[in-house]
Amino acid sequence: MPTELTPTADPRRSLATQAAGIDRTKAIADAQYLDFTMLPATSTDAGDAWTTRGQNAVVHHVAARRPGTVVDTVFESETVLILTDAGAAVDVTWEGTTGALAGHGVAVLPPGAVRIDNTGTADLTLLVRSDEPGWAERASNAAAFAEPSPRVAPAEPWPAPPGPEQVRFYKADEHPLEQGRFGRIFRSRSFMVNLLAAHDGPRPADKLSPHHHDDFEQYSLATHGHYTHHIRTPWVTDRNHWKADEHVGVGSPSLTVIPPPTVHTSEADGPGENRLIDIFCPPRADFSAKPGWVRNAEDFPA
């Protein structure tokens, strides 16, 4: 739900209120600041990789700079692959059928046998449900989610897409940014990805947008530049759980997991291009209710 601090020009001011009846006595989870430039990497055929997680999703990020296999496995649930820049390119083989994808965009892969081979020179991000066998425990921050937060709603899958299962790819440049529409949003059964507008240089300090979410995490993936995440944790009845405001800078690539119901805003403050991708699991009902906001709504019904 937007707060009174949100600038009037922000399209999110028109969103409906989120969930009601949250137990305000429960402790609020810590934010996760995962700057991949500071974390140990796993070496893969395609490049260095980092696996991190929130409560509902695992984020596997690969600095794909050479030809090689990103993943070759069988998934029980759908996955989403983000090609983070124009130089990204992959061959995706799903259930024996191979297709080439190239450019900045979002691909939705149905459950089944998946092989992803890098053919480009830009970072790739694979989104996997945290209940997918064998993935959650790989995360470098897995210990932070040993006990699930009761404040985070479960990731119940949304309706299946009509027609036969297939790999679907949505290129960012085919969905240009528009005034009054918040970013470029793509939805699957389990995920929502928002390719936000880039900031050239620092974001004006008088145009930040503090807001909160009642019952879902926000995964903010910085792919270019530098950001400072400002997070305020509301007081609960137990003073032992009160926290000081946080103002944490992260480079790119990095992932910040923002727990509900913290008040938060992300401030681009790098000197050049700053680019952020917001990820949600499950998809957001409020964004989905806005006509035209979800660019692939016909493929993935609400």
For the regions a language model picked out, list residue spans one by one:
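Extended, charge-rich intrinsically disordered regulatory tails
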Residues: H264, R284-D286, K290-E298
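Glycine- and acidic-residue-biased ligand/ion/polar-headgroup-sensing regions
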Residues: R65-G96, H213-R239, A244-D245
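Active-site scaffold segments
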Residues: S220-A222, L276-I279
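Conserved metal-binding segment of the jelly-roll/cupin
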Residues: A100-G120, L127-S130, V248-G270, I277-C281
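Hydrophobic, ordered structural segments
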Residues: L83-P162
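A short, N-terminal "cap"/entry segment at the start of jelly-roll beta-barrel domains
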Residues: P2-H61, A136-K207, A302
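Conserved short histidine dyad/triad with adjacent acidic residue
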Residues: A57-E76, L195-E217, P234-V236, P260-T262
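Short, low-complexity cationic-aromatic patches
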Residues: W50, P67-I82, G99, G105-V108, ...
